[in-house]
Amino acid sequence: MLIDIIRAVILGIVEGVTEFLPVSSTGHLLLAERFFNLGEGNFWKSFAVLIQLGAILAILALYFVKLWRIALGMFTDANARRFVIGVLVAFLPAAVIGAAFGGYIKHYLFNPWVVCFSLIVGGAILLWVDQLDLKPRYHDATAFPLLTYFYIGCAQCTAMIPGVSRSGASIVAAMLLGTDKRSAAEFSFFLAIPTMLGAFVYDLYKNHADMTADNLIIVAIGFVVSFITAIIVVKTFLTYVTRHGFELFAWWRVIVGTLGLIALALGL
């Protein structure tokens, strides 16, 4: 039980730190499982999805006032209504692709080699976009054009490949479509709510039989750790990228992916 608690804490930290950074939480969790023997077995694979609820609630807590105002104004405020529609439009491509190909993707692509290559390629793309002399036209994540929301949602679908990063894909697309860095990051947070909630509900439905009393305690520990870590990371991340951009995270991806490939090639 103690070993399981330690695993839950470590994986909760990994989830909370990486979920909203453009570095791929799924990729990092898969690498943690492969190289440190963390999270082997069906329960632990479900655990990695279930503790995402902690990260989702972190966003709801941080943006509660803004999201509550939008919810209240959905039927009276055209801007609030447009934003809600925009989030749904952005979420739709991932919902369709996930339902159609999710099982295939998990079966064939969820392995450390794919993760490492995706980390490196995604890091190179993030570094390239971060250094472009882009002229932002949109500075409010709740006021993008509807077509922009849709294109961001399409880009997010690439993150079904482990190692790509859901937030990274949506941030890169948003910046190329004319948003500034802060609003690109913020919208990736908002888009995470329906996307991750959908994955959470689906996985809970499929694997509820594995949820024994002991397992629920382990999930609860991972959930709390993920929530607290995500709160700290999101607040720090927004301040950092506004001032410094995404270069640090791009290099992080490249270094982790390269070290992972070396370790795999050596049979570690």
Swiss-Prot record:
Subcellular location: Cell inner membrane
Predominant cellular place of this UniProt entry's protein: membrane
Protein EC: 3.6.1.27
Gene Ontology CC terms: plasma membrane
Gene Ontology biological-process annotations: cell wall organization; peptidoglycan biosynthetic process; regulation of cell shape; response to antibiotic
Stretches that traverse the bilayer: 47-67, 83-103, 109-129, 144-164, 184-204, 217-237, 248-268
Keywords: Antibiotic resistance, Cell inner membrane, Cell membrane, Cell shape, Cell wall biogenesis/degradation, Hydrolase, Membrane, Peptidoglycan synthesis, Transmembrane, Transmembrane helix
Pfam families: BacA
InterPro entries: UppP
Catalytic activity: di-trans,octa-cis-undecaprenyl diphosphate + H2O = di-trans,octa-cis-undecaprenyl phosphate + phosphate + H(+)
Its membrane topology: Multi-pass membrane protein
Molecular function via GO: undecaprenyl-diphosphatase activity
PANTHER family, A to Z: UNDECAPRENYL-DIPHOSPHATASE
More details: Bacitracin is thought to be involved in the inhibition of peptidoglycan synthesis by sequestering undecaprenyl diphosphate, thereby reducing the pool of lipid carrier available.
UniProt function note: Catalyzes the dephosphorylation of undecaprenyl diphosphate (UPP). Confers resistance to bacitracin.
Family note: Belongs to the UppP family.
Record's protein name: Undecaprenyl-diphosphatase
Organism: Rhodopseudomonas palustris (strain TIE-1)
